[in-house]
Amino acid sequence: MLSRLFRMHGLFVASHPWEVIVGTVTLTICMMSMNMFTGNNKICGWNYECPKFEEDVLSSDIIILTITRCIAILYIYFQFQNLRQLGSKYILGIAGLFTIFSSFVFSTVVIHFLDKELTGLNEALPFFLLLIDLSRASALAKFALSSNSQDEVRENIARGMAILGPTFTLDALVECLVIGVGTMSGVRQLEIMCCFGCMSVLANYFVFMTFFPACVSLVLELSRESREGRPIWQLSHFARVLEEEENKPNPVTQRVKMIMSLGLVLVHAHSRWIADPSPQNSTAEQSKVSLGLAEDVSKRIEPSVSLWQFYLSKMISMDIEQVITLSLALLLAVKYIFFEQAETESTLSLKNPITSPVVTPKKAQDNCCRREPLLVRRNQKLSSVEEDPGVNQDRKVEVIKPLVAEAETSGRATFVLGASAASPPLALGAQEPGIELPSEPRPNEECLQILESAEKGAKFLSDAEIIQLVNAKHIPAYKLETLMETHERGVSIRRQLLSAKLAEPSSLQYLPYRDYNYSLVMGACCENVIGYMPIPVGVAGPLCLDGKEYQVPMATTEGCLVASTNRGCRAISLGGGASSRVLADGMSRGPVVRLPRACDSAEVKSWLETPEGFAVVKEAFDSTSRFARLQKLHVTLAGRNLYIRLQSKTGDAMGMNMISKGTEKALLKLQEFFPELQILAVSGNYCTDKKPAAINWIEGRGKTVVCEAVIPAKVVREVLKTTTEAMVDVNINKNLVGSAMAGSIGGYNAHAANIVTAIYIACGQDAAQNVGSSNCITLMEASGPTNEDLYISCTMPSIEIGTVGGGTNLLPQQACLQMLGVQGACKDNPGENARQLARIVCGTVMAGELSLMAALAAGHLVRSHMVHNRSKINLQDLQGTCTKKAA
């Protein structure tokens, strides 16, 4: 029950960070302000003379107070030093934020408690620093930092609060009750110290439950790398935190704490209300007396300076004990910042390192369709291959063995030959100096201790030991990348696990996996990764479209496709270029809901088609994204099932995730008006996505684009090697009549899917969406003064495409998008990059249609494919597309 309440509290705080932060700061300032305006206007040393204060200061034990301050500073220093060993600047920053704001809240409470006299902070702050505990704060931060998205951040913070909240609450209660016993001792100084201690515990608890989780959520949201769509703070080293923190505290310890709490409550009740029902002085009054605030020992004086100057002079003036304390703090700060950097880096190299964020150059601000001059960084090199003269000489089949990682100083990325069958297995992490791995695997218990150790980690385990832990179910195979020190080693170990289960262990030898930036793949593109598939990428162009020239990348294994498209681009360019327009832009999602009766469904349909109903659904839908804007609803029913097709703009993203989120919110809003409505599925195939559907052909989906060009008769004869009359005749009887006879939906073209799929693979699109995106009707007719010129147009109503998210985050795909000048989001005009890419797709399809139809009209198709699409290589002697083996 308590865990559920704390979970709800954590989710609320993480979901509304601005409101919680502003509310907390406002409450803190109000506490100070109310005291400043309503408190005592007698300030010692400024307008009142307090002789007892001087006496108390002289009689106090300065040595003990100085030692206490120094111990407190050392304690905080060691806490931050331990946090630094985790290797995360975010952990350090968030913990520092927690400390600073906690001290601010505590100072406010002390000022309010002591009636705006700042002198009490000298004694209070050491107790605050000694009682502050960053372990809980860092544990909650680890929960958040192990997330892959902002939604997961909120969920993990809520989960962390559910686990840590009850324990921290009980600990704070016990600490307050234990320390509070000292307030009943009768010793004035001890009572004041214990009062400060209780206030410190309460201030820490207040900040941990409100301000801190809100700040964690906000900081991580603001630190997202928006261009890549991936968080730069995701820490692979903390991926196990959910499992580690899931273990509940010892129930025996919790029961003992509760019994102690009840006993201490009885002690406090007896001492305060039974044994001494009318205490003479409260702790606050005694503290004021101790600080010289009692009226009977003060006399009024005329202030010589303003109040702010008085406080400033008090802060600047320093006694010998303050000089010692400040000197120690400065020395430790200098040591921590400057002299521990090398030591920390050395220590972190022996741990699970944090995945480095992807470094990308800034984009130009003057043009939304921008190009980046440099894409690949030193540590993000794409795979390259080198010719090895020894490969063709030695053709024996080699079994995959663990790899030795290349030295970091190597400037070349190559596929490395695998170890021979007689070679001993070597771990990827075993190349670090000072790390010696045993030749035989150690016991699972010892390996688990090393893996979970903050000082060691997976780098101190061999591949054989990791495989042993996976086989024993101690490590899930799908988490190998997050648990290893590098993603690549996780992929390598998974390949070894898989090879042992295959009938042919050498099956993966030509599937590369080295030197690939897997940080962009994890959590976004693929799971259970065993490598990547190199596909040849050709270029067709220049394509002259709307007054600009484009070199179009095409990833394909079909011979003649790029050459044919390139010929079509040349014909279009010689004819003066093509023109294009985007007719519509809107992604769709079609959920299916059910009501008790068909008449009820009809009533909901009628309500949705009214302006009021549409406005309600649109408000809920639009609230889920700054880009998603509901455009229209298309509603139909089948019996008591209701199908609602929501169509919305999605910016530069393809938009399926965005519109699905908005659809879900809209359906929940619809349920508020019709409680009997049952949501069957957020996708009811009425969208329609990745399936042939007439609704996409008629209504459109994604981008609807039309492209046209006029090819002069001379170009038709000399470049396309045919005549306008022949091309028009073939187009009518093939693309129109032939497709109609076949009952085609949207297939009134020669081979639009060829070009669409090739561009989609090259540019990181969802290749399965070529089903709807390839809908195209190609029209040709004679034109010009003598009817010898060729007019051609392609209309594509459902190009589902985007330039951000998914595969567009991968570096090779980004390179292809940059070739076209449409990589990333367009800041000046959101959605323009995606629309421009759709135009390029349609223009390239038209070029492909032009060339293929010309080949068919001239009878050249079979001959060209026999020349360009039939390999003459003896496949029996083929070593593989990669000149070196992958493992």
UniProtKB/Swiss-Prot annotation:
Localization terms from the record: Endoplasmic reticulum membrane; Peroxisome membrane
Catalytic activity annotation: (R)-mevalonate + 2 NADP(+) + CoA = (3S)-3-hydroxy-3-methylglutaryl-CoA + 2 NADPH + 2 H(+)
Glycosylation: residue positions: N281
Residue(s) carrying Phosphoserine: S871
Active site positions: E558 (charge relay system), K690 (charge relay system), D766 (charge relay system), H865 (proton donor)
Maturation and modification: Undergoes sterol-mediated ubiquitination and ER-associated degradation (ERAD). Accumulation of sterols in the endoplasmic reticulum (ER) membrane, triggers binding of the reductase to the ER membrane protein INSIG1 or INSIG2. The INSIG1 binding leads to the recruitment of the ubiquitin ligase, AMFR/gp78, RNF139 or RNF145, initiating ubiquitination of the reductase. The ubiquitinated reductase is then extracted from the ER membrane and delivered to cytosolic 26S proteosomes by a mechanism probably mediated by the ATPase Valosin-containing protein VCP/p97. N-glycosylated. Deglycosylated by NGLY1 on release from the endoplasmic reticulum (ER) in a sterol-mediated manner.
Bilayer topology: Multi-pass membrane protein
Membrane topology, Cytoplasmic segments: 1-9, 79-89, 150-159, 221-248, 340-887
Uppermost EC category: oxidoreductase
UniProt xrefs under InterPro entries: HMG_CoA_Rdtase (IPR002202), HMG_CoA_Rdtase_cat_sf (IPR023074), HMG_CoA_Rdtase_CS (IPR023076), HMG_CoA_Rdtase_eu_arc (IPR004554), HMG_CoA_Rdtase_metazoan (IPR004816), HMG_CoA_Rdtase_N (IPR023282), HMG_CoA_Rdtase_NAD(P)-bd_sf (IPR009023), HMG_CoA_Rdtase_sub-bd_dom_sf (IPR009029)
Transmembrane parts of this sequence: 10-39, 57-78, 90-114, 124-149, 160-187, 192-220, 249-275, 315-339
Main localization category: endoplasmic reticulum
Similarity field: Belongs to the HMG-CoA reductase family.
NCBIfam families: 2A060605, HMG_CoA_R_NADP
Protein name from the UniProt record: 3-hydroxy-3-methylglutaryl-coenzyme A reductase
